[in-house]
Amino acid sequence: MTDKITVIVTLYNRLEYARNMILALQQQTKQIDELIFVDDGSSEKLMDFISDLLVDCKFKIKHVYQDDIGFRLARSRNNGAREASGDYLIFLDQDVIFNNDFIENIYNSRRKKRMIFSEALLSSLEERNKIQELINQKF
């Protein structure tokens, strides 16, 4: 039996990051089983925004919506965890950028019973835009 992996992404507006997340996860060397977007009251309609990507997507995508009554990151993550069907949950923010072997590295670390944690690498908006341009060139 294969372990199921769920990625839970907190989201608020800036829906282009949701598209980038789906595209990046489709390029992973280890595929996930489920992607859950926990939307903290975005004004735009997420599923309409990503509908063209759903056709060829190899993993299930869920959208969990909660009303925007202020920044509630912990509640968003808890709501995503409640909806998850995976054996292993990976929590990400909407604007994270990662390598194509990111999921595989986390999965392999888990199999070796290592502690798994993540640390943010802060970058300027200019650096982030350059990175995003490079990513978009691949797709």
Question: PLM features: what roles do these ranges have?
Answer:
Residues D33-S42, V64-Q66:
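Short beta-strand/loop segment that forms part of the nucleotide-sugar
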Residues D101-F139:
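Conserved donor NDP-sugar-binding/catalytic core segment of glycosyltransferases
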Residues D39-I50, V96:
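A conserved acidic beta->alpha catalytic loop
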Residues I22-L23, M47, G86, N100-R111:
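Short alpha-helix within the catalytic core of nucleotide-sugar-dependent glycosyltransferases
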Residues K4-T6, E34:
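Cell-envelope/extracellular polymer assembly enzymes that use nucleotide-activated donors
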Residues R14-Q27:
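Short, well-formed alpha-helical segments that are part of the catalytic scaffolds
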Residues L89:
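Short aromatic/hydrophobic "clamp" motif used to bind/position activated sugar donors
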Residues D67-A84:
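Glycine-rich, basic loop-to-helix element that forms the pyrophosphate-binding segment
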